[in-house]
Amino acid sequence: MGKKYVIGIDYGTESGRAVLVDLEGNEIADHVTPYPHGVIDEVLPESNVQLEPDWALQHPADYIEVLATAVPTVLQKSGVNPADVIGVGIDFTSCTMLPVDASGEPLCLKPEFRNRPHSWVKLWKHHAAQDEANLLNEIAAKRGEAFLPRYGGKISSEWMIAKIWQILNEDPEIYEQTDLFLEGTDWVIFKMTGNIVRNSCAAGYKSIWHKQDGYPSKEFFRALDPRLEHLTETKLRGPIVPLGTRAGVLTNEMAAMMGLLPGTAVAVGNVDAHAAVPGVGVVEPGKLVMAMGTSICHMLLGTEEKYVEGMCGVVEDGIIPGYFGYEAGQSAVGDIFAWYVEQGVPAYVKEAAEKEGISVHEWLEKRAAAYRPGETGLLALDWWNGNRSVLVDTDLTGLIVGYTLLTKPEEIYRALLEATAFGTRKIIDAFVENGVKVDELYACGGLPQKDKLLMQIYADVTNREIKIAASKQTPAVGAAMFAAVAAGKENGGYESIVEAARNMGKVREETFKPIPENVAMYEQLYQEYTKLHDYFGRGENDVMKRLKHWKETTRAAKEFMSLW
């Protein structure tokens, strides 16, 4: 048998990335395809329909564009014979969900529904279902639902049930016309294979499904809304299968589009961050993997099911078979730094960066690195896009304390970097306090590859060594590993994801170790961060929520008046 290859496709927030990998984990070729429509958060495409605050949608055709463009490109770049590609795997942002009709067609592609916002793909960071999430949590807590502690005591507005309930409340016709609500990852697998299969990772973490107990009871859904009573056996129906399972094989049509052979094995879909865990070779407890990009997803393996405040979920076999997979997260990290560069940096910084021939991020990082911990006099709360863990509250907002007339842009930038590190420390402390060990950290994604200052700050704040993924496309490599498992040993692949990870997972030789004097100062700053975190985040002062409420009601009144 000649040399064999697999392809992993990582569907991110702004683009899709395909990576062609050999069975030793060497990346042969990769290609990034930006989504033509990007993130839709203001106006629906080809219409003047305005979106409300906190909406974030996408166009499903963009996902197919990735298959049609990125896969043929990596084949062409590499010169690999399509006959030597034994499998394809994908991962996806989650919960990114869409309503489809009985033929699997997204409702937003049908002319009669094109101008209806609820017919479109709801991106993971669509936060407009917060009211539904609040009520769901209230009802679940009153009923003493067993599932609630598995999700840190709260179900997020980002997840499947809250988003479905928002559709039902705001556009019941779209709900009625929907045959199935699917995760984006499961829909793309359907397009490739013709088979509807739901992956156990997204079902477990985002749709309140449990390996032993299944979905919550009909009685629970009836308590939410009588119209939801039969949701799980109707619009959420379909087999739920473990990661690494073969979902099917490429259809003739999709094989032709992608430049591969019909019959090529396709793994069930996966969630982007979770695919990164085997991607860095982690297949045992005690190693926290941080998928760092626009947001951070924190993944950890354990040998038993523990309840941890604010975690996004604990799912048996959810990441690696044989372990309980824990997930927590921060709703904005890279997005905060990007916001500051785009909205908050004075013109002289942009001009200086241009003169030096570097990006604004690089200019700020270079100057921020000259400061010692505590030297900026600033402290921030990293809630620009709400708080995912441990407070699970999208109505919280950002905060910076300590401004003076002498505060410089690089000081603000450093304070924002530090704030996100404190947010990660808060998550680590929650795990450790509840009996889930965290001995070392692994980082992958765009940020660790380019921002050494950020990674050193994280090592100092958490007082743990950090290992960095060798790949810039770790989730895609992880997805490729699952493709190798779906292909099977008999076709040149692997028997299990553990075997695949041990042969294909790679980290860099360079690591980031805590600097003792920095650790000591950051410990003091973290105690102050914790006071602010609890004061603004646990109900002592809900000023952030009041400000957000006044903003929304004032804006709504202004828009109403403009109609007259």
From Swiss-Prot:
<keyword id="KW-0119">Carbohydrate metabolism</keyword>
<dbReference type="GO" id="GO:0008741">
    <property type="term" value="F:ribulokinase activity"/>
</dbReference>
<dbReference type="GO" id="GO:0019569">
    <property type="term" value="P:L-arabinose catabolic process to xylulose 5-phosphate"/>
</dbReference>
<dbReference type="Pfam" id="PF00370">
    <property type="entry name" value="FGGY_N"/>
</dbReference>
<dbReference type="InterPro" id="IPR005929">
    <property type="entry name" value="Ribulokinase"/>
</dbReference>
<dbReference type="GO" id="GO:0005737">
    <property type="term" value="C:cytoplasm"/>
</dbReference>
<dbReference type="InterPro" id="IPR018485">
    <property type="entry name" value="FGGY_C"/>
</dbReference>
<dbReference type="Pfam" id="PF02782">
    <property type="entry name" value="FGGY_C"/>
</dbReference>
<keyword id="KW-0418">Kinase</keyword>
<comment type="similarity">
    <text>Belongs to the ribulokinase family.</text>
</comment>
<keyword id="KW-0808">Transferase</keyword>
<dbReference type="InterPro" id="IPR018484">
    <property type="entry name" value="FGGY_N"/>
</dbReference>
<dbReference type="InterPro" id="IPR043129">
    <property type="entry name" value="ATPase_NBD"/>
</dbReference>
<keyword id="KW-0054">Arabinose catabolism</keyword>
<keyword id="KW-0547">Nucleotide-binding</keyword>
<dbReference type="InterPro" id="IPR000577">
    <property type="entry name" value="Carb_kinase_FGGY"/>
</dbReference>
<protein>
    <recommendedName>
        <fullName>Ribulokinase</fullName>
        <ecNumber>2.7.1.16</ecNumber>
    </recommendedName>
</protein>
<keyword id="KW-0067">ATP-binding</keyword>
<dbReference type="GO" id="GO:0005524">
    <property type="term" value="F:ATP binding"/>
</dbReference>
<comment type="pathway">
    <text>Carbohydrate degradation; L-arabinose degradation via L-ribulose; D-xylulose 5-phosphate from L-arabinose (bacterial route): step 2/3.</text>
</comment>
<dbReference type="GO" id="GO:0019150">
    <property type="term" value="F:D-ribulokinase activity"/>
</dbReference>
